[in-house]
A protein has these predicted regions:
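C-terminal catalytic lobe of FAD-dependent flavoproteins
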Residues: 74-77, 82-89, 95-176
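Flavin-dependent oxidoreductases
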Residues: 1-81
Length: 176
């Protein structure tokens, strides 16, 4: 939002949109139960570009589009990870819109949980918290970079891979 306010012309020409995602968190799992590494399943293969060379991805994507179009409608793929308190974080969905709704869609949470149950058994799936986030997304590009002034560099739109790429991109930008 600062980018949009401070440099509206550059922002409008950037093609950045917004992505809203819905997430959930369970109550803590029984004491010694641990999930281990983050768990993902087939829908996640369709979401991240890292998997685009997977030979069966096209056939799988076509099957999902035909049999479960609601996953595409809401941009759903499912990840589950456990925090130090034993809670399972579950998500997420992807609604691309310049003005995403402030209201969450209960059907999205239901679809995510039903899909999660199809490949993961968790002792306690009692959902104690639900939230959504909104981030900047640059379709078909990894980041937007502009230099509106000699002392200003704008880097934005890394949403979707920001937690993975942000530190490397920051280092690259500062070293220029």
């Amino acid at each position: 939002d600062d980018f949009e306010s401070l440099y509206p012309d550059i922002f409008r020409s950037s093609n950045i949109t917004r992505c809203k995602l819905q997430m959930m968190r369970t109550s803590p799992q029984p004491e010694r139960w641990r999930l281990g590494p983050t768990v993902a399943a087939g829908l996640t293969l369709r979401h991240y570009d890292s998997f685009r060379n997977c030979k069966s991805l096209s056939a799988y994507s076509n099957r999902i589009a035909k049999e479960s179009p609601e996953f595409d409608q809401w941009g759903i793929h499912v990840l589950a990870s456990q925090n130090g308190a034993g809670e399972i974080l579950i998500g997420d969905s992807h609604e691309y819109d310049w003005q995403p709704s402030i209201f969450d869609q209960p059907i999205i949470d239901k679809l995510i949980l039903n899909y999660l149950k199809s490949f993961l058994v968790v002792p306690c799936l009692e959902i104690t918290q639900r939230w959504h986030g909104v981030y900047a997304k640059l379709p078909r590009q990894s980041e937007f970079v502009a230099y509106p002034d000699t002392e200003v560099t704008i880097v934005n739109g890394v949403g979707g891979a920001g937690m993975t790429t942000a530190f490397g991109l920051a280092e690259e930008t500062f070293n220029q």
